[in-house]
Amino acid sequence: HFMDARGACLMGHSHKEPLEERYEDILNMCDVLFDNINNWKTTSNFIQIVSARFSTQEMRIKSRIQAIQKNGKKVTPDKKILYAFQKFGFIRDLKITQENVSFCFSSPMDKQYVINYGIWLELFVYIHAKRSEAFDDVWLGALIDWNAYDASRMAGNEIDVVISDQSMPVFISCKLRSADTAAVNELMIEKKRIGGWFSKGILVAFGRDKQEKTATYLRAKEFGIEILDAKDILSARFEQILVKTIKEHDLISLKWKKV
């Protein structure tokens, strides 16, 4: 692997990579979630609160239609989103009444996806990168073991999507929210630690940073990190945009920047 030279190696994956036959279901579900992002936030909160009451192995969920968050606020799941999860095969036996909601996760892997707010953007980017057939290799949720040579234990040892493009590592961080300086810094450190100069960093974030040329966007640019935002994610051409961003990323101009 390209990581070995710097004393880091791929330890494996934090999330199971989806089977190819599930790609279509996942992308259809992404459409629903990304188009209703605020409802997905509350629904995701609800699912997490309720799932926490049951063991990790438990596939069946039953609850009152309202759950109470730590801050005392009540959350109710969005019916449209729950029905979509059932339609695309992530949950089954969905029953919603005025007071209660119950369903089964279709499999342990489906449960991992449904209870995770941000994983859908990672899956979305991963599937589009795979489908483009433009790259040598694509990994989802690559866990990187810094301990190989390094005494300092990095907290951020997971990179959402890693792509090998003609043996150049491309690190992609996915945030289902606006980009922020912390996200840029984190990606920059990871990129520098593993890839050095000969690597690329891309932040895919669900904000308006690229359109509005925000401070975060400008900071990222300064460090040679590309940002794709909600407009790109919601575009029918996301796959082409992703490939173009990776292939055309200008490495030469980065070399002389002081980091």
PLM segments and residue spans:
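Intrinsically disordered, low-complexity Ser/Thr/Pro/Gly-rich regulatory segments
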Residues: 1-259
